[in-house]
Amino acid sequence: MLATLKTYPATLNLLLCASLVLTLARAVTLPYLVIYLSSNFDLGIADIGLVIGSTLIIGSLLSLYGGFLVDRMHSYPLILTCCAVFTLAFLGAYGASQLWLFYLCLVLVNLAYAVIDIAVKSGFGSLLPVDQRSEAFSIKYTLTNIGYAIGPFLGAGVASLDISLPFLLSAGLGAGYFLIYCVWGDKNLATVETGQPPTPFLAVGKVLLRDYRLVCFTLGGLLSAVVFGQFTAYLSQYLVVTTTPGTTYRIISTVVATNALMVISLQYSLGKRISRRHLNAWLAAGLSLFIVGLSGFALSTTLVVWVIAMAIFTLGEIIVFPAEYMFIDSIAPNHLRGMYYAAQNLGNIGAALGPVLCGLVLATQPAQYIFYMLMLFIVAGGLFYWLGGRIASDRNLEPLK
């Protein structure tokens, strides 16, 4: 991976750096939001889930307009503006004494992060030929997971001094990237096609809704994100119901470490092999591995079985993430690439709904039923992906194989 990064232009490496640094900034604080909301604002567990989930959903919905801006503006001022919002929102969260202000800051953090993520992915389309993009997507996802793996440890270190300090550290990381991009960012980078006439936001939205491939891929991503978007949350819920707190902590810490190590070590080498010619086959393999992994979770009685099930589940994750990016990349017109990636971000709604739906099932049904429900979501998501891959687009592309 390092050898590949050395061949990339500085502009592309700066975009990839955003994925690492800004993800690290989020990961510093995200694991401690539950504790912070409980201790500082005296919220119950249900209200905490509502706050965290709804801010993610609102940020994802608002990022649709961010994708529109990616297609209309040069990336340099847009990334700098969003990075400034990201930094100031963390500073605001640090000083917020009222829940509504803290809530607003969380929405802004999620929105700014989502728009920068869209700009980064759109930048791949401007800077790389088609056959090199899957490799770049795999590098991006690897760096993202490195950020999520390291961030909680940094957050734990500063939170031991003061529970509010992780927000300051996150703001510092955001400010650091702002300064780096301000000095070395490419001021001419854009996904804008000058020959395209300006189109209102709502008109662009209608165009997207008429692209049935995009609709199918978005629905497929939303349904499958219920399963892999926040798997640690529903696994924790399941273990709390079925085991002791000590066992829950031991299993969760082990499977999370297994997931992180596998993604960091295998994502690049496996993800770069995913090609546009056989996306449906790759995705079917990844989704099948999810189902096998979920079956393993349902049957797990020992730590070893949990680790094996997580290893299989993680292989599915390693395949599905770059395959999803390549699906969107394969159908997105150059002048609407930002909007198409913004539509893909709606999968975060599924990620936010996963713990909620699993909580409802755990409260009303035998505990193992959550895994049967999640398997149904994988099957439904795979069906929408298959339908989208079989629809011939208006751009005369061959159906995906």
Regions found by a protein language model. Name each.
Residues 62-74, 265-279, 362:
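Helix-to-loop junctions at the C-terminal end of transmembrane segments
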Residues 335-364:
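A late C-terminal transmembrane helix in Major Facilitator Superfamily
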